[in-house]
C-alpha cells in the first residue's frame, strides 16, 4: 500500500505530495484509557520511515476498538480542510467492528464531516467480515470493504531480471551523497528498508 501510494500520479502527470500516518490498535499493552490505541507516526512524507515502522509492528492479540482508532485519528491528526485533496483511512482487523465505547457510527460521522474516506480491510472470510460489521460503506460514505487472507503466502515467481534489478538498485544507492547527519540517517534507513523488503520476497522488493 505504501509503495502504491508513493507511485501515485495526478491527472496532469505530476507527483502529488503524499503524507501518511500510522496507528496501532488492539494491543493489550497500550493504554486502556486510550482504547488500546497508539499513534506510531503522525503525518509524514518519509515513506521509508513509514515502511520501517510497519515492519516493526507485531501483533499479540487484544480488543480491537475500530471506532476508537478511526475517531482518534480523525481528531488527533491535522487533516487538510481542502475538498480537492484525497483523504483516506485504511483500517485492517479481524474482530467485531462494534467493540469499544466509541461506535463506528460516531467515527464515520466525523469522517464525513472532514471529507475523509474510510476503507476497511477484514482479515478473514468475507461473510464473517460482514457479520462483524466491516462493510461500513453505508455509514462512512464511498469507502471500500476488502477481504484478505493474512495467512496466504505471496506467490514469489522468480524472473531472469531479479538479480539485475537488485544489483542496479544497489549501484543507484551507491551514487547518493549524504548531506549532514540527517542525510546520513535517511540513507541508512533507505538501505535498511531495502533489506526488509528483500527478506519478504523478491516480488515485493522489485515493486519497491
Q: What is each stretch, according to the model?
A:
Residues 1-153, 159-162, 208:
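Divalent cation-coordinating acidic motifs and surrounding scaffolds
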Residues 139-141, 145-208:
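C-terminal "exit" segments of structured domains
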Amino acid at each position: 500500500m505504501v509503495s502504491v501510494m508513493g507511485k501515485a500520479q495526478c491527472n496532469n502527470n505530476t507527483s502529488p505530495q503524499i503524507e501518511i500516518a500510522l496507528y496501532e490498535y488492539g494491543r493489550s499493552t497500550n493504554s486502556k484509557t486510550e482504547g488500546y490505541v497508539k499513534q506510531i507516526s503522525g503525518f509524514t512524507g518519509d515513506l521509508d520511515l513509514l515502511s520501517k515502522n510497519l515492519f516493526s509492528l507485531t501483533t499479540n492479540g487484544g480488543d480491537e476498538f475500530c471506532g476508537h482508532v478511526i475517531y482518534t485519528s480523525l481528531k488527533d491528526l491535522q487533516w487538510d480542510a481542502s475538498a480537492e485533496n484525497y483523504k483516506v483511512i485504511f483500517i485492517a482487523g479481524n474482530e467485531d467492528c462494534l467493540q469499544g465505547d466509541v461506535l463506528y457510527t460516531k467515527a464515520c460521522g466525523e469522517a464525513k464531516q472532514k471529507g475523509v474516506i474510510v476503507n476497511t480491510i477484514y482479515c478473514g472470510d468475507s461473510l464473517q467480515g460482514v457479520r462483524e460489521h466491516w462493510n461500513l460503506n453505508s455509514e462512512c460514505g464511498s469507502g471500500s470493504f476488502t477481504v484478505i487472507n493474512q495467512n496466504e503466502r505471496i506467490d514469489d515467481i522468480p524472473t531472469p531480471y531479479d538479480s539485475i534489478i537488485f544489483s542496479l538498485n544497489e549501484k543507484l544507492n551507491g551514487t547518493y551523497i549524504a548531506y549532514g547527519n540527517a542525510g546520513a540517517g535517511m540513507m541508512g534507513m533507505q538501505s535498511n528498508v531495502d533489506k526488509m523488503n528483500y527478506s519478504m520476497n523478491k516480488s515485493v522488493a522489485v515493486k519497491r
